Amino acid sequence: MTAPAPTSPARPTPARVLVLGDLVLDVVLMASVPIESGTDIPGRVEIRQGGSAANVARWLARLGVRSQLVCAVGRDGAGRSLVAQLRKDGVNVRAVRIAGHRTGRIGVLVAPSGERSFVADRRAATLMKADDLKPEWFDGLQLIHLPAYSLLVEPLGSAGVRAVELSRSRGARGVRVSIDLASVGPLLAHGRREARELISRLQPDVVLATESEVEALLGRHAPEGILEIAKVAVIKRGPLGARVFARDDRAAGEPPLQFDIATTAVAAEDTTGAGDAFDAGFIAGWLGALASGHGGTDALHRGTLAGHRAASRHLRSPRAELPPG
């Protein structure tokens, strides 16, 4: 009698993740010498696909996640090109076309030191309405991810809140919500109290942020304070790695779980998008670990390590420009 062939363990089904937010043109100006006002300086100008939400969605697809982006673009060539390129990258793009408004653009000025400054002209990206969302887009989701500035301007903010509601009503059991604080400027412009109350009402499972973004939201340098509005806080510290705080089943008054995950510093003249790659790596690694039966703390470790790997890959890779036309 022939012995049955050994069977390998079944692989977990790829996670379904929806990201809601910007898909824009990035116009990146990289100065070769210190920037001076009132004169020309040498450098490079590149046109890239941009938007934090789009960057996260693209990296999720690269990492094997069933990635979906819900965004708004203009009825123009830029919008068509951006959507087509992202679909080629494996993302299921649900693009709302906004008549009479052009696709958003972000100017990124990169100094020789690597310091970045941004000029945001988001245009159509902010004009998605709650009524534009189709409930079936949210069927079976394991997680919905939003950059905070998808919540801080109307009518996009109402669409973001509605998207979270639809995810919880139509997504998989135990669907999770992650929010990246994304940028200091929009948090301060919206008002830290209002921004904090809005994010808190959404009851996110995870908030990802830099230390400066935490301070902008809370008004103090206390990253663990994010646990007042989320179950997990992942603090991105660049070359210093990441610090994770989590609430668990500890008794009231006990300190939260806290651990650091180091990374290897990567020399890069332009770090644009590295934080988005980290978010995607964390989400993919965390959900994958949970699906494989790893406990909560172990899954957070694995997710954070995966975030570092994705960010390092991003920093070491050449940045693709949009094809001409």
Regions found by a protein language model. Name each.
Residues M1-A72, G77-A84, K88, I106, ...:
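Glycine-rich phosphate/adenosyl-contacting loop at the front of the ribokinase-like
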Residues M1-L18, G219-G325:
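Conserved phosphate-binding/catalytic region of the ribokinase-like
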Residues D22, C71-R75, V110-P112, D121, ...:
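Cofactor-binding loop segments of dinucleotide-utilizing enzymes, especially the Rossmann-like FAD-
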Residues L23, Y149, A277:
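Active-site metal-binding loops of divalent metal-dependent hydrolases
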Residues Q85-H101:
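A glycine-rich helix N-cap at a beta->alpha junction
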Residues I98, V108-P155:
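Conserved phosphate-binding/catalytic loop of the ribokinase/pfkB sugar-kinase fold
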Residues R105-L109, S117, G241-F245:
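Short beta-strand scaffold segments in enzyme catalytic cores
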Residues L143-E224, L240-A242, R247-D248:
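Conserved beta-alpha-beta core of the PfkB/ribokinase-like small-molecule kinase fold
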